[in-house]
From Swiss-Prot:
Keyword terms: Chromatin regulator, Metal-binding, Nucleus, Transcription, Transcription regulation, Zinc, Zinc-finger
Residues with site note (Histone H3K4me3 binding): Y212, W218, D222, W227
PROSITE patterns for this protein: ZF_PHD_1, ZF_PHD_2
Any one biological process term the GO annotation gives: regulation of DNA-templated transcription
Listed name of the protein: PHD finger protein ALFIN-LIKE 1
Subcellular location: Nucleus
Length: 258
């Protein structure tokens, strides 16, 4: 692989922005993270047959790269030492034939999650504490590659579907207008996702981390704007009707500045 391909993280077609400059703002770093994540997800789901074939155990140490133009590539690691960017897990091809296929893909997914975070925080090294915290929150709002590939996110959905739904459809009109639109099919969630589609990212409960579902009662905090299962914060639809401004437990416990 050409060294410049790996350095600017965009691949031959370019991923936006000239001169191979590194992303510097929280928004630009998150955009880079999201694009690389989309590339990795495509390799491990939509293009999995091609990816599997390229990871020949007879070849040398191979790595899975995701780029900021949403392209992926199986290639040898960078020759320069130290590398300009953190490198993904080395030798993913060696374990391919010695493991169950699903387990092997899950293992690659776990290592890919680690790599995606390391690249993002390599770029975030010069951000201040609050910006790093905000960046991590944005990244953490997306399911991990492992969750998507292993299906653990969907399993949690099935577990919740068996709960009593007698009051789930009674969602306060006060709190429904701002509910984020959620993609139902997780494995296709990032296809075609661009910088203007931020409102389509998954909404997760601020308490339990569960994914938003329209058949459950949710309430949004008017201070931090995070969303919560009503049952997680002990708020019923009837109680929500009488609340003019809802503060989540976290915001309620914060002392006002003197």
């Amino acid at each position: 692989m050409d060294a410049s391909y790996r350095r600017d993280g965009r691949g031959g077609g370019g991923g936006g922005g000239g001169g191979g400059s590194a992303p510097r703002s929280v928004e630009d770093i998150f955009k880079d993270f999201r694009a690389r994540r989309t590339a990795i997800l495509r390799a491990l789901t939509h293009d999995v047959e091609d990816f599997y074939a390229q990871c020949d155990p007879e070849k040398e140490n191979l790595c899975l790269y995701g780029y900021a133009n949403e392209a992926w590539q199986v290639a040898l690691p960078a020759e320069e030492v130290p590398t300009e960017l953190p490198e993904p897990a080395l030798g993913i091809n060696f374990a391919r034939d010695g493991m169950n296929r699903r387990d092997w893909l899950a293992l690659v997914a776990v290592h890919s999650d680690s790599w995606l975070v390391s690249v993002a925080f390599y770029y975030a090294a010069r951000l201040n504490r609050n910006d790093r915290k905000r960046l991590f929150g944005m990244m953490n709002d997306l399911p991990t590659v492992y969750e998507v590939v292993s299906g653990s996110r969907q399993s949690k959905e099935r577990d919740r579907s068996g709960m009593d739904n007698s009051s789930r459809n009674k969602i306060s009109s006060k709190h429904t207008s701002d509910v984020a639109r959620v993609e139902n099919n997780i494995k296709e969630e990032d296809e075609g996702y661009d910088e203007d589609d931020g409102d389509h990212s998954e909404t997760l409960c601020g308490t339990c981390g569960g994914i938003y579902s329209a058949d459950e009662f949710w309430i949004g905090c008017d201070v931090c704007e995070r969303w919560y299962h009503g049952k997680c914060v002990k708020i019923t639809p009837a109680k929500a009707e009488s609340i003019k401004q809802y503060k989540c437990p976290s915001c309620s416990s914060k002392r006002p500045r003197q």
